[in-house]
Design a protein with these regions (language model features):
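Conserved catalytic/acceptor-binding region of the Class I
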Residues: 37-102, 106-123
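C-terminal lobe and adjacent flexible extensions of AdoMet/dcAdoMet transferase-like proteins
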Residues: 101-185
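Structured loop/turn residues at beta-strand edges in well-structured enzyme cores
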Residues: 4, 81, 147
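Short catalytic micro-motifs in class I SAM-dependent methyltransferases
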Residues: 13-17
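A short glycine-rich, Lys/Arg-flanked "PGG" loop and its adjoining helix->strand segment in the class I
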Residues: 22-37
């Protein structure tokens, strides 16, 4: 898309699969018009925390689940991309399942696996899965297993051309080259 060509960007529960959130937000800022609105939701790090912990207790050093950015990381990335007036919120939802396999089947059905490029490869094996299920079963309450989902919602506005943005520890201003006055003799 061309620079400054879009009025609104809306993304619902997709950005957690993006391997480089700051780069995605910088691209959003590039294509949004002045005063364009960015609205999105994404999962946070407490999503599937029970399942992650069960994998860790089963001896899995790297649970086969994608990591999710925390609300502070999301906000920092929005500011670094140059968005103004960011507003973020987080909500925790707990869904319950009759067993761990029902949760795993649902995750597989929605394509929610490990999206990391550098994820460990190979099969986990039935014994690892059995250990994870045993660890998860310890959380059973009223004949159901809990599954926490942290949802981060965010909105921000695109500033006008020439508004500084953060890159590292410096503010960087940019403006169209045709606005540079020319002196003629």
């Amino acid at each position: 898309f061309a620079d400054n060509s879009i009025d609104l960007i809306f993304s619902n529960l997709c950005l957690q699969w993006v391997p480089d959130l700051p780069a995605a937000l910088a691209e959003f800022r590039r294509v949004l018009r002045e005063d364009g609105l960015l609205l999105f939701s994404s999962f946070g790090p407490d999503t599937l925390i029970e399942l992650r912990e069960a994998y860790l207790q089963a001896g899995e050093r790297h649970p086969p689940l994608s990591p999710c950015a925390a609300i502070r990381q999301v906000g920092d990335a929005m500011i670094a991309a140059g968005f103004r007036n960011p507003v973020l919120d987080r909500d925790l939802f707990t869904l319950t399942y009759p067993d761990a396999m029902s949760l795993l089947r649902e995750l597989r059905a929605i394509g929610a696996g490990d999206a990391r490029v550098q994820r460990p490869r190979g099969l986990g094996g039935k014994s690892r899965q059995a250990r994870m299920i045993a660890a998860y079963e310890a959380l059973r309450h009223e004949d159901r297993l809990p599954s926490t989902w942290e949802v981060i919602t965010a909105m921000a506005w695109a500033p006008g051309p020439g508004t500084p943005r953060r890159e590292g520890n410096a503010d960087v201003a940019s403006f169209p080259a045709d606005r540079i006055p020319r002196r003629t003799r």
